[in-house]
Amino acid sequence: MNNQKTALILDAGFASLPLQQAVKTAGFRTLVCSGKAHDAGMLTADITCEQNYADSEAVLKIAQQHKVAALLPGVTDVSYLSGCRVAHSLGLPGFDAPDVSDTIFLKDKFRAWALSKGLPVPQAAWTDEQARQLKLPLLVKPVDAYSGNGISKVTDWAMLDAAIETARNASPGKQYVVENFCEGALYSHSAFIRNGEIVCEFFVDEYCTVYPWQVNSSSLSQNLSPDMRDSVSECMQSIVSDLRLVDGLLHTQFIASEDQFWLIELTRRCPGDLYSRLIELSTGVNYAGWFVAPFLGKSSPAVPRRPVQTRNIARHTVSVNRAMRFTRFAFKSLPADLIEVIPLTRPGTLVQPAPGDRAGLIFAEFRDDAALRQMTPHLKDYFLLNTYEGHSDA
């Protein structure tokens, strides 16, 4: 009789594969739930269930049927929000309570909570009338969408109504938030929490060079000052303490100028597009293993608070600004070695414009940190698509 425990993973996308492997390495049988039967994770799981995991009642029945010992989110917000409700019902570890999760994940709730606490976030509004009290330019966002879907920049009041309609249409709940547009560079902060304290953290430079609201190039931060890192870290620790977050990952995108920063989005799921692999290649830290540990009832190992960057790694998501028929990748010369290329489509497939689609992921190792800093913002000019129509930039 097989006494191996079963872990249910709510995601089958390619970026969840490192999580699935980490769960297997920890000794669990993997049961993957997804509404997309052909996703990569459905091919590698021990057991599969074709079900839209946004339906938490259906997920609860699956978990009970298979008597799962652990439940994990993947790289989507929905996987965490659905999972936290099921875990709350079953008493499984790793998730915050549903009300805390909603505060973190839903943009309108987080903005309102953060403003009430005096945290550094853009000024926000939730109605047309309130929005007109803010100063231009503005960003209008759906409160519950992802990957930059439905976001518009408003530079003239005549644009506001259309931007609100775009956000509503992209929102499953038909809700939006309007906020001041903050000038600065985009970064992420990925922190692991243990016993209410941030014990390990990473800072990453992020660039949106194809679609303005979706990251496609990144590396461990070469630009953020030590003082700014400390300020962001202290701010995130205050959130951890205030919300009494459980052990695990807290991942944040923020914008910073030379002397101030603004929190943009927080999440407790694993960031997508193989962010875990970027950290692992750059520092040697088993990011995916650390992420899954609390959901399996385990602790992550003790390490330095800010692990040293040991390799000059850049990550690039190959995407396009107009529909293209994919045939193959092409690469221009760089002072770097291509160390991993992950195709996400097949020859002949029509790749849709970002943020709705991408053709592949590429990891490159630069020869020194100066080259990494200089070249990462420009990777879209070096990693290209070849199409039936001819040679085209990606």
Predicted segments, located by residue:
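ATP-binding N-terminal substructure of ATP-dependent carboxylate-amine bond-forming enzymes
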Residues: 1-100, 297-301, 311, 320, ...
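Active-site nucleotide/adenylate-binding loops and adjacent lid/helix of ATP-dependent enzymes
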Residues: 101-177, 183, 194-197, 222-238, ...
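Phosphate-binding core of ATP-grasp and ATP-grasp-like enzymes
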Residues: 167-175, 180-222, 230-251, 255-263, ...
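A glycine-rich beta-turn/hairpin centered on an aromatic-Pro dipeptide
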Residues: 296-337
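A structural supersecondary motif
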Residues: 250, 335-348
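Short beta-strand-to-loop capping motifs
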Residues: 155-156, 191, 318-322, 362-368
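Short, well-ordered beta-strand elements within core beta-sheets of diverse protein domains
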Residues: 152, 180, 280, 360-367
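Gly/Ser/Thr-rich active-site loops/lids in small-molecule metabolic enzymes
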Residues: 279-293
